Amino acid sequence: MLRIINTQINMSTDWILRVGDGENLRRSSKYKIWGIQTITSPHGKHFIKNVKHGDRLWFVKSKSQGLVLAVATYVSHNKREFGPLLNITMTNEELGWTGDGIDWTSDIEVHYTDLYNLTQCQLLTHIKGASTIRKYDDKCKVELPVEYNYILRYSKITLEL
């Protein structure tokens, strides 16, 4: 039984998601929802096509040498739906998100669980580039899969950031 569980953990993919200054993530963390753009972002499209249940989502602050704010476990995603009379999904206002511009608006909700607040850990990925979502690779200065094992061992799941 232990061998099967260990195999499942090792098959998880680590995804790095840039979250601006982190304030929108902090405000919506109580709902366990993050938003991504797939209409104009090839990185968002790639993520939606390849992410799977149990993958790890590393939320990283922009323009901070890649400061890791939190890690969570991916559960699912869905298209955000707003109607003239009734909204099927939560609005930006309900989630506490602020911002403007077409590139800012998220068309997909990403649902996660097991959120760990890492704001005090000073984990710096040092990843550069314009990509808002990417798979973990050797360009990352922190071995995220190794760190995740320590996080599981020494941290507690948080209800929100």
What are these regions (language model features)?
Residues 2-24, 33-46, 80-161:
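Contiguous surface segments at macromolecular interaction interfaces
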Residues 27:
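Short loop/helix-cap segments at secondary-structure boundaries that form the rim of catalytic
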Residues 66-68, 81-82:
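Short catalytic/ligand-binding loop motif for oxyanion handling, primarily in non-cytosolic enzymes
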Residues 68-77:
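Short beta-strand-centered aromatic/proline hotspots
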